């Protein structure tokens, strides 16, 4: 189900944060968010439950927690500014929400890069019903 919603959003041309996050992921990992991270493990993509399957999935769990901590923000649609210098993502000026959303996305993209060596193709398009372990708290 999670994959359906992500593909639907991509097809209608979502502007803003989701596309910015995809660009950050591409810059850091040389992989597109879809298909590599949009439905990986139990937490990458829409929603999440259970225990993260590996370090990459934990990046998504932490990213979800980061978004949860934002109050009165729209992390999936707010547009923020950032730049890319010598392999480093630098979040730019903006509202407090925009800065925090950018930092959440930057941290996740860096986490994905750091965990590329342990990325497992078997967790791509992982089915939600397989995420049966008790969920962790943020």
Curated annotation (Swiss-Prot):
InterPro entries: PLipase_A2, PLipase_A2_Asp_AS, PLipase_A2_dom, PLipase_A2_dom_sf, PLipase_A2_His_AS. Expressed by the venom gland. Its EC number is 3.1.1.4. Residues 1-16 form the signal peptide. Binds 1 Ca(2+) ion. Pfam families: Phospholip_A2_1. Its cofactor is Ca(2+). It catalyses: a 1,2-diacyl-sn-glycero-3-phosphocholine + H2O = a 1-acyl-sn-glycero-3-phosphocholine + a fatty acid + H(+). Disulfide bonds join 42-131, 44-60, 59-111, 65-138, 66-104, 73-97, 91-102. It is found in: Secreted. The keyword Transcription does not apply. Ca(2+) binds at residues 43, 45, 47, 64. One of its GO terms (molecular function) is calcium ion binding. Gene3D superfamilies: Phospholipase A2 domain (1.20.90.10). Heparin and wedelolactone inhibit the myotoxic activity. The PLA2 inhibitor, para-bromophenacyl bromide (BPB), inhibits enzymatic and myotoxic activities. GO terms for biological process: arachidonate secretion; lipid catabolic process; negative regulation of T cell proliferation; phospholipid metabolic process. Keywords: Calcium, Disulfide bond, Hydrolase, Lipid degradation, Lipid metabolism, Metal-binding, Myotoxin, Secreted, Signal, Toxin. The active site is at 63, 105. Monomer. Binds to calmodulin. Snake venom phospholipase A2 (PLA2) that is myotoxic and displays moderate edema-inducing activity in rat paws. Does not show neurotoxic activity. PLA2 catalyzes the calcium-dependent hydrolysis of the 2-acyl groups in 3-sn-phosphoglycerides. Negative results: does not show neurotoxic activities. Belongs to the phospholipase A2 family. Group II subfamily. D49 sub-subfamily. This is Basic phospholipase A2 Cvv-N6. It comes from Crotalus viridis viridis.
């Amino acid at each position: 189900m999670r994959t359906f919603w992500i593909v639907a959003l991509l097809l209608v041309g979502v502007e803003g944060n989701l596309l910015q996050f995809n660009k950050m992921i591409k810059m850091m990992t040389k992989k597109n968010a879809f298909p590599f991270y949009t439905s990986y493990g139990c937490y990458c993509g829409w929603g999440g439950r259970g225990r993260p399957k590996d370090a990459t999935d934990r990046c998504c769990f932490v990213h979800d927690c980061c978004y949860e901590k934002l109050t009165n923000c729209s992390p999936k649609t707010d547009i923020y500014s950032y730049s890319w210098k010598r392999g480093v993502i630098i979040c730019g000026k903006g509202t407090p929400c925009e800065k925090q959303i950018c930092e959440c996305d930057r941290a996740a993209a860096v986490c994905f890069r750091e965990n590329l060596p342990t990325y497992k193709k078997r967790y791509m398009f992982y089915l939600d019903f397989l995420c049966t372990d008790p969920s962790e708290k943020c």
